[in-house]
Amino acid sequence: MAVVKKYEHLEEFIHCVDIGIDTNTDLVRWTRPQTNIFRLEMLHAREMAKPGIYLHIEKSNRRTVFIRKEKIVFIIVADDSVQYQLLEAILEVTMKAFFDSYEDLLSGFLTGMTNMFGGFQSLITPLFIKALKENVRWISAHCNVCNANHSVCVKKSFINNAPRYPASIVFKHEGHGLLIYIDGDFKIRGQEVVEITG
């Protein structure tokens, strides 16, 4: 698929993946070479993070997505061309891999023992591709405002765990939003332009 080909080198679009506990405890930080990520941005996201809910910040041509699982906050920062659902899918596979690797160690973890997580950094880039190939589906939606077809990234878990169908999602683009209704087979069952605020 052309959209997946666009992200063949997905790591070039990702600025940073940060895993930490509080303002003083960094567990893992993967950063793309020649990228400036300010520590204050990571600390702000860690303070704002909520359990089980992906939060988004968009500024300066970058998107930040973050979530808290137990006491650990997972953060990803990417170019604003990367859709939020793909960033969330990357965090999903990152959280699963992290807890699969370290869950037993985390219960006895003490602040200052962060060097034991160093090996996880080498797993992060392959997780980008895993998320892209296994955890998302691309659907094509037509917007009547801009008279164009758009490839929209949808997390498989979003549809598979939906409480009812069709599930609804808003694709924000070019200053407006397109509300899309998706069934359990990832087929579009309706769409309409909606107003956005925030």
Where are these regions (language model features)?
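Short metal-binding segments enriched for Cys and/or His
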Residues: 169-196
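Short cysteine/histidine-rich zinc-coordinating motifs and their immediately flanking basic loops
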Residues: 154-161
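Short functional micro-motifs and their immediate structural scaffolds
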Residues: 148-151
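Acidic, low-complexity cytosolic segments
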Residues: 1-134
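Short cysteine-rich clusters marking metal-coordination/redox-active sites
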Residues: 140-146, 173-174
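Flanking scaffold residues of small Cys/His-coordinated metal-binding clusters
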Residues: 135-138, 166
